[in-house]
């Protein structure tokens, strides 16, 4: 690992450009040609993510510092939520993964920041394999079906957004996504109990996967099945939380107050990215910014309910992808790692064209944020503070615009009853 963060981030930027070029150049030109098999695809996913994770001595500064506070408290036997004062806005699951990686770093000499990134890299590799397996299961068992599955899996293996979140930022979104995508896959395989357990673990890791629960419940055939699935999916996080509170004789407020109300930061996504900084220049706009922040939960709830109703005749995967798009489209608060949510489910739903365009726009936002705020703040050296702030805030508008257009297209397809998955020409002809 480099000790010079400036040199490391500069070389990491070159690596990002190379991987993004591979992502852009990847095309399903000939689905009858030779495409790599799944072991090679998984190897590509690992080799794309490991170099920057190994040579970068930094991640997103606030997050890595928070992980260190959490693991120090956990390994010293202290109650984490009381000890770190709001720095872990999650339920008690990922902290134990972090604790295990911190102990690994201490015993092997592996740099702490590298150890914190490894679970997300492994989860990303596993997600790549899941995408391949799920797509090939839904396609013909000949070479064309394999080629289409390989293409979609490679779009994740080479995806700049997943690369930035796991290997640069150091966030663990991929772990949550693997559990949630696994829950969907088990649901597709008619294994509702295993599906509910996987979804429960995803909710325990980060609370936002609870959005998947109504999608499944609406598609179960009886009230008994609905209650059983819900009880298992919610029972797992409830039991773990209760066990943690009892074990430490802890006050639930520090844990639940953050985990159940965390909504990201306003002013970096959608209309709030323009309105919040503009209110600093023109104070007359501040009341409008305050109203937008005050209504954020109502807007989120309304968008989610509308998406659930609109997609009730679609498959669980199509409905969930549209639901995620609706939530991301209207949210006021935002975390840059949330940009990864859409990509694995878009590829599982075979929305390759939209996933490609969105990934490039989202990677632009992530790069500007990571190189402007969270790693070595290069932008602060090149631009004045107001210009850097405006650039960082407005960098999300291209990705947000893609989300809006994508959502509109999916809502129209749902209304018309058209299939959401793309049909490659070679497969459509057969």
Model-predicted regions and their roles:
Residues 1-257, 264-266, 293-430:
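Multi-pass membrane glycosyltransferase architecture that uses lipid-linked
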Residues 258-298:
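Membrane-lumen/periplasm interface segments of multi-pass, membrane-embedded glycan/lipid transferases
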């Amino acid at each position: 690992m480099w000790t010079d963060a400036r040199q490391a981030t500069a070389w990491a930027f070159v690596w990002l450009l190379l991987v993004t070029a591979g992502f852009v150049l990847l095309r399903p030109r000939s689905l009858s040609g030779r495409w790599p098999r799944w072991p090679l695809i998984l190897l590509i996913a690992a080799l794309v993510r490991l170099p920057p994770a190994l040579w970068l001595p930094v991640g997103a500064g606030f997050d890595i510092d928070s992980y260190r506070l959490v693991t120090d408290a956990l390994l010293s036997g202290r109650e984490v939520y009381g000890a770190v004062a709001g720095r872990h806005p999650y339920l008690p699951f990922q902290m134990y993964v972090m604790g295990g990686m911190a102990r690994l770093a201490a015993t092997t000499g592996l740099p702490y920041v590298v150890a914190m990134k490894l679970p997300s890299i492994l989860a990303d590799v596993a997600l790549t394999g899941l995408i391949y397996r799920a797509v090939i299961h839904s396609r013909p068992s000949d070479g064309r079906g394999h080629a289409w599955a390989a293409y979609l899996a490679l779009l994740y293996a080479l995806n700049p957004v997943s690369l930035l979140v796991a290997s640069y930022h150091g966030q663990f979104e991929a772990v949550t996504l693997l559990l949630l995508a696994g829950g969907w896959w088990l649901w597709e395989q008619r294994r509702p109990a295993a599906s509910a357990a996987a979804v429960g673990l995803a909710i325990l890791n980060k609370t936002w996967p609870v959005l998947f629960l109504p999608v499944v419940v609406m598609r179960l055939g009886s009230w008994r099945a609905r209650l059983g699935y819900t009880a298992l999916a919610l029972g797992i996080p409830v039991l773990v939380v209760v066990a943690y509170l009892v074990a430490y004789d802890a006050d639930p407020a520090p844990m639940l107050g953050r985990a159940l109300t965390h909504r990201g930061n306003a002013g970096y996504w959608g209309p709030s990215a323009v309105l919040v900084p503009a209110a600093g220049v023109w104070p007359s706009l501040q009341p409008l910014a305050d109203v937008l922040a005050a209504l954020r939960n109502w807007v989120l709830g309304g968008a989610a309910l509308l998406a659930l109703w609109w997609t009730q005749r679609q498959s669980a995967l199509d409905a969930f992808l549209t639901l995620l798009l609706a939530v991301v489209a209207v949210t006021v608060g935002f975390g840059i790692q949330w940009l990864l949510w859409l990509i694995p489910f878009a590829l599982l739903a075979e929305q390759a064209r939209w996933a490609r365009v969105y990934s490039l726009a989202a990677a632009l936002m992530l790069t500007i944020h990571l190189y402007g705020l969270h790693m070595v703040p290069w932008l602060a050296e090149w631009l004045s503070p107001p210009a850097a702030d405006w650039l960082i805030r407005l960098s999300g508008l291209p990705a947000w615009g893609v989300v809006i257009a994508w959502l509109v297209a999916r809502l129209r397809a749902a209304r018309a009853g058209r299939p959401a998955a793309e049909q490659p020409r070679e497969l459509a002809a057969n």
